[in-house]
Curated annotation (Swiss-Prot):
Posttranslational modification: The precursor is cleaved by a furin endopeptidase.
Gene that specifies this protein: Adamts4
GO cellular component: collagen-containing extracellular matrix; extracellular space; nuclear speck
Protein name: A disintegrin and metalloproteinase with thrombospondin motifs 4
Quaternary structure, from the entry: Interacts with SRPX2.
Amino acid sequence: MSQMGLHPRRGLTGHWLQRFQPCLPLHTVQWRRLLLLAFLLSLAWPASPLPREEEIVFPEKLNGSSILPGSGVPARLLYRLPAFGEMLLLELEQDPGVQVEGLTVQYLGQAPEMLGGAEPGTYLTGTINGDPESVASLHWDGGALLGVLQYRGAELHLQPLEGGALNSAGGPGAHILRRKSPASSQGPMCTVKAPSGSPSPISRRTKRFASLSRFVETLVVADDKMAAFHGTGLKRYLLTVMAAAAKAFKHPSIRNPVNLVVTRLVILGSGQEGPQVGPSAAQTLRSFCTWQRGLNTPNDSDPDHFDTAILFTRQDLCGVSTCDTLGMADVGTVCDPARSCAIVEDDGLQSAFTAAHELGHVFNMLHDNSKPCTNLNGQGGSSRHVMAPVMAHVDPEEPWSPCSARFITDFLDNGYGHCLLDKPEAPLHLPATFPGKDYDADRQCQLTFGPDSSHCPQLPPPCAALWCSGHLNGHAMCQTKHSPWADGTPCGSSQACMGGRCLHVDQLKDFNVPQAGGWGPWGPWGDCSRTCGGGVQFSSRDCTRPVPRNGGKYCEGRRTRFRSCNTENCPHGSALTFREEQCAAYNHRTDLFKSFPGPMDWVPRYTGVAPRDQCKLTCQARALGYYYVLEPRVADGTPCSPDTSSVCVQGRCIHAGCDRIIGSKKKFDKCMVCGGDGSRCSKQSGSFKKFRYGYSDVVTIPAGATHILVRQQGGSGLKSIYLALKLSDGSYALNGEYTLMPSPTDVVLPGAVSLRYSGATAASETLSGHGPLAQPLTLQVLVAGNPQNARLRYSFFVPRPVPSTPRPPPQDWLQRRAEILKILRKRPWAGRK
């Protein structure tokens, strides 16, 4: 049984986000709900389109003014547009907040014809007929216009007409203009009355302890199915989705300054030797992870380098038992070039949350319903956050759960995000406009449910959940995946959605202004981790004065401080070290080791443990020799190893002095006296070469001995002699009864002392430890062959005898002496000369 039997290694387990089937507002069985609502809709709305007005228009481009330097885009664009009997004059200018400078699309393979090469467009904003209350938000590719117009309470949607002819003036050609009916207008209603008393429908679904800016340089890949579905709008769509994902990572609930940066965009065409994208999510992920590594450059400073890669596909992904899978990623792999990758099934604009979810796994986050998260989130805290196991409406006020924030913080604090500290030389700006301005409710439905879907406007309340048209068994129906309308989607006259609520457009301005955060005061010191022997206590502060808003910068700097506490020695009755106590707590955990013959005696394992793993609880079964990581961290204040006074703090080895104070420079001398000068002990050394078959005594090392070192030297017969240790009671601590310990091990001695043994199979055996020994120890040698010219050398330090000082006479003796002298002075001879 390997270590993985207890603690699966990060990255070996894939996680996927599930989606709900179309769900309707009734509390009975879902399939019956679908049939019932489809039937009601077939009566109230017999296959007729949703109420809206449409007409074909030909926008006329008027003369633009000067060209913006280096961009080829006019500084001001004028368009004249006939609209439902009225002529509209659009005064447009480039929106500086939505440029994506420097980003070029890389096409691999044969690009679909509808792509037509890279999308050269830009984002425009402006007014209509000079009305300051009007809003024009359009995407312009040099000809065609796509976007939303809001004018005098009307909401107009403009998009190119596929196959439309150019107008007579050589303008951008035929467009379709739709005027949507106000949400309050009367018309065919889709209402279902729930039984009396039923609940309302609801949605389901690298400095230590320092906050440092992280920059996640991301490769975004879209497969040929994405290209075929989105056509020329693919680049804009991908950037819009990634902008929403980046916005989620900027929310203060993640408690870290994480910047998601798109550095490369690759679109795959047919015939490309790319990743194998198929129904199996696991196989697709493995194929993509292998393929993306070939695109990366190992040099982190190279502009083409990326820290993680994400694949978007329209392929229906399947897990082990169902095809309700929206994405998959390895866990805790962000700086592993081979496994820092994720796949996302495109499901409309809400795919931004799928992307954020999968990248959360890459940052070592678990699902919010996992056992560790249940303890951190509390009851009912697992359904409205990004890392919920099933896609649902994400709480805009707290998109990341306390568990997600804790796991990414610990992950970064432990040094696993080292590759994210370099800031891109030329950061690329993702679209800053709200996605709902570019993608109206109808388009959002098409992205989610297909090109024939449109918005069902009669299902209140607006913004909370996007309801879209569809068909079931020939009957019209409305369906939802419980995702809210995209932020910025018009929801009424001078109103737009934000966080699932319909707000006045003036209120949206509050969401556009970033506010940087500031540190609050330090909190009180917490409890000490130990009652004696040197513990640790913490104090922390939060980024709350003020809390960052609207993508504002999260606080940087030290967020947690710690100090030593209860540094006095533990009582002499403590037979075990602090680490030994933690291992011994597993002595009766037979439920974790069912393959073992019975309860095991667990002791610390130091030999063979890498320095980076010193603060994991690695314990060894004394009888079997197997060792396992029983806990990912030892308790705070546990010494990192027997050879150092440094202690573990939150899973990391922190320097401490021999006085058990963190940051202290005090050291043990050879006598193991803290801060001593080495004068209290003397070195004893010698050699041994009188070998005979069997066991022979070499030297008895006295109690109190320190810095013990035993080493074999020279000769061709070293393999025939072995070290052994015998305790004062006659029992063996090492290699007794002709039974050898072949591999490196820690020899645990009475008094919580251990010696490090190289193992009997080592080319040259060694035995070492700091001590001091609690009782005498006899060093022996076991001879099993013909040792020629072999020699054994040993050394250790023993306390010097304390020089005796004359004891002062007792007080009563001094008093009696004074009385005797007084009597003698009174004798007759006392005054004679």
